[in-house]
Structures are given as structure tokens and as C-alpha cells.
Regions:
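Short, solvent-exposed secondary-structure boundary motifs
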Residues: 52-53, 63, 147-151
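Glycine-rich, aromatic-bearing surface loops/beta-hairpins
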Residues: 143-236
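A short acidic/basic microdomain associated with nuclease active sites
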Residues: 54-84
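Interdomain/boundary linker segments immediately adjacent to catalytic/signaling cores
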Residues: 1-41
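Nuclease catalytic cores
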Residues: 39, 43, 47, 88
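Short, contiguous, helix-prone interaction/anchoring segments in small proteins
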Residues: 46-56
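Non-membrane alpha-helical secondary structure
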Residues: 3-7, 15, 42, 135, ...
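A recognition module on extended beta-rich or small alphabeta surfaces enriched in W/G with H and D/E
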Residues: 80-138
């Protein structure tokens, strides 16, 4: 993966910020007896921070409407759409090749230039999907609906993941069939030297940010192995 844009580190910082206190206050103030909305509230805070950071840096944050229950936000930097997922969910999507997941659809329409760069061979099932024109057309049409007017301004999609256990933020690259290509760990940064960039919220517990010597870091980025290759939860 070529040198990453500096702005992505700002999004790594807001993506890894904990909103536990904010969410607990919502439950407490409303005297909720259950916490069914916890995952949704967590992502609402994350997407708010992503949108605010995009606005503060004059970047576009597309809204991807997936129906009544879920809307995702990403950010376009230099023609690349970065979407945000928890690491375990990302691994599930590419392991199982969830054919109609939004990541699968957008990757199918935007990442064909990366085909052939994967390390592993295609599974028989995935190989059969290569010849499924109906599926491919369906995925591309879905991608066009999700991205709307932003579709033609996007050249590639990458996935920024957050590992809840290790607190690591990683930028992942996949081909058109969501086969893993490359990953760069962007966690090791000093929060004290990152500008707030006009975000309206104050982070409760920032975990990553930009070091003063970030340019050196960018020029020799640390590549990581296949994200699901060594996961501890495999098979559980």
C-alpha cells in the first residue's frame, strides 16, 4: 500500500475514542432497564465524530443508507473512500464473503484494479462467483445506490478497522472480491500533538493520534499480516 494521507490519522484518533461515559449517561438519564441500543449508540457517536472531522478538514463524508435500521458514514480522501468497521466484523465479512454487504458491493465496483495482488488462491465457491454476471451487476448497482452522486468520484475503497481487544487501528486493502491484499497499522501515535481540528465533541479517552515525526512513519509504514490469520477467536 502506498503512503497513506496524513488526514487518515485524524480519523484513526476519533474512531478509537471511547464514548462509554456518554452512553452510560444516556441510559442513566432515561432509566433504561435494557441496553439493546448500545451498539447503535456506539456507532452514532463514531459517525458523528467522522462527519465533524471531515467537515473540519474540508473532506467529503458520504452517507450510505442501508435501509431503515442502519446508515454508515465514510470519508473520501484523494479519491479513496475509507469506511470504518470493527475488526471482527470486517473479518467475518471477508471470511464468509457476504455477497450483499455494503463493503462487498462497493469493493466489487471499485477495487478490480487490485485483483491478482492477493496472496491466497480463490476458494471454489468464490471462484464460481467470478463468472456470476448477475451477482456482479447486482453488487455494482447496489454500490451506485449507496454512494449516489459520490460514485464517480471514488477510485478505490479501503477499510479502517478497530480491534476492541488490542485497541489497534488498521487500514486494510482488499480486491474486488474482498480478498485481503495489505494492511497498515496506524495506531502508534502521540495524541498530545494532534490538533482538535474543530471537532464539536471532546473525546473521553483518545487512544491514537499523530506523532511529530509522522512523516517518517508514513514513509516506512508497518505492514501487518492477514488480519484473520492469527486471530485468537478463530473458530469460536
Amino acid at each position: 500500500m502506498e503512503k497513506l494521507p496524513t488526514q487518515i490519522f485524524k480519523f484513526a484518533q476519533v474512531f478509537s475514542t471511547s464514548h462509554k461515559r456518554d452512553i452510560e449517561k444516556i441510559f442513566s438519564d432515561n432509566e433504561f432497564e435494557t441496553k439493546n441500543s448500545l451498539p447503535i449508540l456506539t456507532w452514532d457517536f463514531i459517525y458523528r465524530d467522522i462527519v465533524n472531522t471531515a467537515r473540519a478538514n474540508d473532506l467529503t463524508s458520504p452517507s450510505m443508507d442501508m435501509g431503515a435500521l442502519w446508515t454508515a458514514r465514510g470519508v473520501i480522501i484523494e479519491g479513496i473512500l475509507y469506511v470504518f468497521m470493527m475488526k471482527r466484523r470486517f473479518e467475518d465479512v471477508i471470511d464468509k464473503y457476504e455477497k450483499h454487504h455494503y463493503l462487498t458491493c462497493i469493493a466489487r465496483s471499485k477495487n478490480s484494479h487490485l485483483n491478482g495482488k492477493e496472496d491466497n488462491k480463490l476458494s471454489t465457491e468464490l471462484f464460481n462467483d467470478l463468472d456470476d454476471d448477475e451477482l456482479s451487476n447486482s453488487q455494482i448497482e447496489q454500490a451506485k445506490k449507496l454512494l449516489g452522486n459520490h460514485y464517480n468520484s471514488i477510485d478505490e475503497i479501503r477499510v479502517v478497522t478497530f480491534d476492541k481487544k488490542t485497541k489497534e487501528v488498521t487500514v486494510n486493502q482488499v480486491n474486488a472480491f474482498c480478498e485481503f491484499i495489505d494492511a497498515v497499522n496506524i495506531t502508534e501515535f502521540d495524541f498530545s500533538e494532534l490538533e482538535e481540528d474543530g471537532r464539536e465533541n471532546s473525546p473521553e479517552k483518545p487512544l491514537v493520534a499523530l506523532k511529530s515525526g509522522v512523516q517518517k512513519q508514513l514513509e516506512s509504514q508497518m505492514h501487518v499480516s492477514l488480519p484473520f490469520e492469527k486471530r485468537e477467536e478463530n473458530g469460536k
